[in-house]
Amino acid sequence: MKALTSALVLLFSVAAHAGDARQLAKLPAPAEATLREEMLDNLVTLNEILGLVVAGKVKEAGEVAEKKLGTSTMGRHRNKPFEARPGPHMPPAMHELAMKGHQAATAFAAVAATGDREKTLAALPTLNSACVSCHLAYRVR
């Protein structure tokens, strides 16, 4: 049974990538692990921001956006070994999208800091546009 399960997992993973036209960004294993952990953290943060906006806590949502996603977070991996730092191993266009994502979070934070709920809601889709663009264009596996 274990062999059958393993074969099915392999078959489905090969089939899943067969139609995947995204560019493979081959990163060293430690950098890939760092990036995947960061992406999961970003999803949790986006969910937190959405919850705060819905609750009417737009200023707090902006603070979270800057603290966890904004330009102030750039370079957070600088103390890791080079092989564990995703940025230097990314294709240049992928790295540019990552920078745009940080910049978008900072721009969203500035809008949210005004406390204007309507403007914050209007800015919300820009918060993850670079994320979506990057995930549509690149994969690490």
Where are these regions (language model features)?
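Sequence context surrounding c-type heme c attachment/ligation sites in exported
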Residues: 19-141
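N-terminal signal peptide c-region/cleavage motif recognized by signal peptidases
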Residues: 13-18
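Residues in flexible loops and secondary-structure boundaries
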Residues: 9-12, 61
